[in-house]
Amino acid sequence: MQPALDRAKAFFDKRSRVPGKAAEQLARLQADVEGRGVDRADVVIEAIYENAAAKRELYARVEPRLKAGAILATNTSSLMLEPLAERLAAPGRLVGLHFFNPVAQMPLVEVIESAVTEPQARAAALAFTRAIDKLPLPCRSAPGFLVNRVLMPYMTEAMLAAGEGVPLATIDAVAVKFGMPMGPIELADIVGLDVCLHVGRILSSAFGGPAPDAVAPLVEAGKLGKKSGQGLYEWRDGKAVKPAVEPATPAPDDLEDRLMLAMVNEAMAVLREGVVGDADLIDAGVIFGSGFAPFRGGPLRYARERGVEVVVARLEALAARHGERFRPDPGWSSFGGPGAP
């Protein structure tokens, strides 16, 4: 617990410009390893590892101590809420509050409701998110919610391209040229290859696309990415060591579309399924949650600007060349052009 408090102190010292303010903020943090404050809390956030059984076991110990009206929130990044809530005495109090790393810098929080979440719990979760100066994105319970659901095909496609012999640095360079803050290979290393593999397998099981199994040997060897110093790249002093992009071996001419349209097509699936309420929220969520090239307006705005018919035709061409994972989502048939709802 002390290392966490030390990090908080360093953060407050760096951000506070008012004398004494950092000490005041730090004093409001209470280390509570034994959970003695649970019975007084308005919001209790669970953030243990992604295992449904472990989460349910924790809830069984915590829920009896919650006061009336308190909400129980999970920081799950990919698990549906319904199985997590099934053994709760009051399943309607469970919500999802999915923060993104680094939490201090990422403004977005996915606020997830299940089929049984009570309106009061949903409203309280949204209000709490705003109160801590975050941007709440309402989502329906579904594997991966919005951001991870859209990101995973992008990162998996990058790994498939790498398996075909495309250099890692070339893959990242193509994404950065499009406008992404970093490439999918570097992003996977930062997220953690163990996390990518776990989430990717959950989404593959749910939706049938490929999983990023190519990284399994690295995970088994403890090469997890930035946090272990070695992953797809070697990491030194917090930075990826990338070989120079070789001009003599240019990227495949369809690589940009393979990466970006994988995201775009998945964003359409999220819209069609009603996981997020409208296209504008999806675009905002993907920009703030993943860093999708902001000047392009988000994946669905990008599709509108490029032309829905053009995007669908490119997806069909990619499906013919690379497989059914690129088959255009049925939602494109009712998706309008610029200015359409």
Give residue spans per PLM region.
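N-terminal glycine-rich phosphate-binding loop for ADP-containing cofactors
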Residues: 1-341
